[in-house]
Amino acid sequence: MHFMGYERPDGSVGIRNHVIIIPSVSCGNEMAARIAEQVPGVKPIFNNHSCSRLKTDNDLATRALVGLGANPNAAAALVVGAGCDTVPASEVADGIARTRKPVDYVDIEKDGSYGKAVEKGVAVARALLAQTAALERKSCNIGNLTLGMKCTSSDTTSIIACNPVVGQATDFIIAHGGSAIFTETTELIGATHILTRRAADESVARTLCRRVEEMRQRIKRAKVDILRSQPNPGNMKGGLSTIEEKSLGGIGKAGTTPIKGVLEWGERPRTKGLFFMDGSANTQIVIVGLAAAGAQIMSLSMGGGVCARLRTSTINTAGGGLPVLPIIKTLSNPQSLPEADYFDVYVGGVVEGRETVAEAGKRLINEIIAVASGKMTKLESFTSPFQEVWEFYSIGPLV
Amino acid sequence: MNQTSHRKAKKAVIMTAADSVAIALDDLASGDRVKIRSLLQEIVGELKVSDSVPYGHKLSVKPVAKGAEVIKDGEVIGVASQPISPGQHVHIHNIVSLYVPPPRTKAPKARREP
């Protein structure tokens, strides 16, 4: 099975062909915006990484920044920095250059002044656009895709409809030689027994448990123990009675294949198949982590509720979210039908018994192939005056 | 016309045949008749509801002894903390997690009568 994608020099395949501007630190956001303003078509990815962080978090940010540039949906990248940054622009550019895609960087120290850095950035961005604009889509195997997954605003319909429907797509992509990644370590506290049964081997199961316990201990250090806080009052009001039941609903999206490994936040899988990525359940952080890990397409499955009524929920941003990771949104709850137009795929029919999970799964797979071949997602087609500043996962304190 | 028999049958869905619970797809009241269907849209049973069960909550489709496993989607989601009979609401009042102690719920403060 095939889709029409962009072949990259490192053998990966993109479903978008963006020239992106990556500030290596939040001080570079304004410069990136200034350059983007003068070069229509380039996509800045603003972020919140700043000074006053510990090495562990600088390392996480570096991997994320390199990963965003290395993502196959970026045809080329321009990195911008000040020159004094905790994550130097040159280091990010060097990391991206290993993919052999066009990349360059500007910083105030190297280029002499703010004005000169912006001026050079504009020239570089124009050149990168010109260099990559002529690339054409070619027929590529589905096995080149890595699907990122998250569920949100989960309710009782999620386990019946949207998550098993996404699970069908996950199994389909993996059956064709591709990969899929799910994450949200916090959601597994108290529920590792459900997931470890899916682990490909003993070592994967052990790593998974260790990651979950580390997360729990971090939370405990903040003087909160969330072991006994799940399911939360909203979940219980919706009918979920135990953590097992809640976790069971969430895992549905990961399909039925074994978990091949546990990734660090933003880490690229080394083999194909299903992976779990350590990290926060915060949607923005999940999106950045998945994109940095090389996912070219993402599924966001939503139960319903107020979140469904936010048109761009839960990714408020101009032009549809993180440019390097188009998101296909699936809606489950028939009570949210008035909002179905904000979503790419509506699967409430499964809840109402008008459609089977397999039938809805086929529709989602077709949508994934269409979006991978260039169809704009609902989020991509919305314009908004707001630009998201992307958040990076951090584990240390701000100092 | 008979006053009790023309109550419209309400709906619930059962994920797998092994499950001890179905999920209410209507707000159910005690005395309601509920049609249980599978994910393949077949009607697999019908029973009389003995509690009120809100939309999305679980109702028992088979007897579960105290301490026995409660199955949903083919998986154990907890054990019964008291005997459960078909048609009953299944929730935190009668099932508990096997792994995590029940959530801390704030006990209502004793009210002083005026």
Predicted stretch roles:
Chain B
Residues 2-114:
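N-terminal small-residue-enriched
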